[in-house]
Amino acid sequence: MVSFCATLIRQFRHRSAAAFQIAESAILANKSITLASSACSVNRGQLQFGIQIVREYSKASKMSTLPRVFFDMTADNEPLGRIVMELRSDVVPKTAENFRALCTGEKGFGYKGSIFHRVIPNFMCQGGDFTNHNGTGGKSIYGNKFPDENFELKHTGSGILSMANAGANTNGSQFFICTVKTAWLDNKHVVFGEVVEGLDVVKKIESYGSQSGKTSKKIIVANSGSL
């Protein structure tokens, strides 16, 4: 998206440098198209097109700066595939950084080799306990627990990435990936990202779950890191 918009911007600038400059200035000054076009002889249609492209480029550039991390998953040591997650560092920077650093293992501990210990079909897949491996442990990069950052992002559907907790302000390293919309968790669990690739892998993991949460196969994060 960024490269596509950049190409359009180059083409637009080449066709009408004046329109491009005015479009850019109009956005920066928060001026209307009418006001900007009335101050010059540039065609209104050209100016409108320019403003649209500059805005899309700005939006795409911002989106491209969000960190992405991955899990390479196995079930009973058989490869399942890769899950790629985009972290909302723009909304919950502290929570996103915790997850990112645990994916890379740069603090000396993290998700590599850990399991998904609780998987409930039509609900979620939970992991992140790399200390006790049963849902009772884990720790954050900030120490043991850290506070809820905010609840701006919601549990809107499949692929949403959220912090597991034992109550308010008890975030550590445990997390879950939703497989359905879970609105009842809004304002109780901090959403900090979503799956952008490999949702089919999440569905495979879900298929090994049960209503009790016990998995029929050992689901392991064989490798993890940043992209």
From Swiss-Prot:
Residue ranges annotated for the PPIase cyclophilin-type domain, each copy included: 70-226
Catalytic activity, as annotated: [protein]-peptidylproline (omega=180) = [protein]-peptidylproline (omega=0)
Modification Phosphoserine, positions: S158
Places the protein is found: Cytoplasm
Known EC number: 5.2.1.8
Coiled coil: none
Keyword terms of this UniProt record: Cytoplasm, Isomerase, Phosphoprotein, Rotamase
UniProt-listed GO biological process terms: protein folding; response to oxidative stress
Family annotation (InterPro entries): Cyclophilin-like_dom_sf, Cyclophilin-type_PPIase_CS, Cyclophilin-type_PPIase_dom
Gene3D superfamilies xref list: Cyclophilin-like
Group of enzyme by EC: isomerase
PROSITE patterns, per database record: CSA_PPIASE_1 (PS00170), CSA_PPIASE_2 (PS50072)
GO CC list: cytoplasm; cytosol; mitochondrion; nucleus
SUPFAM superfamilies: Cyclophilin-like
Activity control, per UniProt: Binds cyclosporin A (CsA). CsA mediates some of its effects via an inhibitory action on PPIase.
Annotated GO MF terms: cyclosporin A binding; peptidyl-prolyl cis-trans isomerase activity
Annotated family: Belongs to the cyclophilin-type PPIase family. PPIase A subfamily.
Biological role stated in the UniProt entry: PPIases accelerate the folding of proteins. It catalyzes the cis-trans isomerization of proline imidic peptide bonds in oligopeptides.
Protein name: Peptidyl-prolyl cis-trans isomerase
The organism of origin for this protein: Drosophila melanogaster (Fruit fly)
Gene: Cyp1
